[in-house]
Amino acid sequence: METRILVVNPNSSKSMTVSLRETIEKTFSMESCKISYFTGPDTSPPQIDGQETSIKSMEACLPLLIDDQESVYYFQKFNGILIACFSDHPLVAKIKDRAAKEKADVSIVGLLDSSINYCNLVGKKFSIITSNKEWIPILNNSVESKFLTGNTVNKNLWKGTVSTDLQVLDLHSPENFQQIAEIIYRENIKKLDSDIVILGCAGFSGLQNKLAKTFQRDGTLFLDTIEIGLQILITMIRFVNSQK
């Protein structure tokens, strides 16, 4: 049976969706999995750079995903949905609530929860690299209040969030790679002593291999949140299907 997945880019930047699609198609076999892509409407912000734009993007996208049963993006037409924004994005909770209310057989995953849960399981020191500075307190608060396990806290494995001081849409520009790499080396690797660096924005998608090669001698694992989010989502779907 074909597995149907919807990847939701909640901002209105089509270039971001194209980048996500390119990364996913390089990483995943599509033989038994059909992946569709949704870009936020024009009323959604072009980039999500904090709480206000997160809420605006949720308000713009949610009706298109849960209200119109004729839409190709209607949530119950999919086995799983990946919200491709690295935050505690309100779309995740809203769609989960609707799915639970209607007893819909669909798994919903966000990039933040899947990444932190992976790091909790691995049990190594980890930190986040993000875009603009506004995200530092937002991500730190979300991680510390909702997603850490007791083991992670007790062993002091969570090291915090670092900003590149770049806007989301600038993260993928080749001319900014050296700046990003220098910040990661100075802050995430040397100062915070991270074994895992979470690439904490969908704008980093596709940079995992380049960063891994750059810091090969340090042995640092760079976690592509799109890749780990999709892997976890597919595993959840397969488990649900195995129980039928």
UniProtKB/Swiss-Prot annotation:
Induction data:
Expression is regulated by various nitrogen sources.
InterPro entries linked: Asp/Glu/hydantoin_racemase (IPR015942), Hydantoin_racemase-like (IPR052186), Iso_Racemase_Enz_sf (IPR053714)
Any one GO molecular function term = amino-acid racemase activity
Superkingdom to which the source organism belongs = Eukaryota
Query: Which Pfam families does this entry report, sorted A to Z?
Result: Asp_Glu_race
- PANTHER family tied to this protein: PROTEIN DCG1
Q: Give the free-text miscellaneous remark of the entry.
A: Sensitive to nitrogen catabolite repression.
* Family indicated by similarity: Belongs to the HyuE racemase family.
Q: What is this protein's record name?
A: Protein DCG1
Q: Which organism is it from?
A: Saccharomyces cerevisiae (strain ATCC 204508 / S288c) (Baker's yeast)
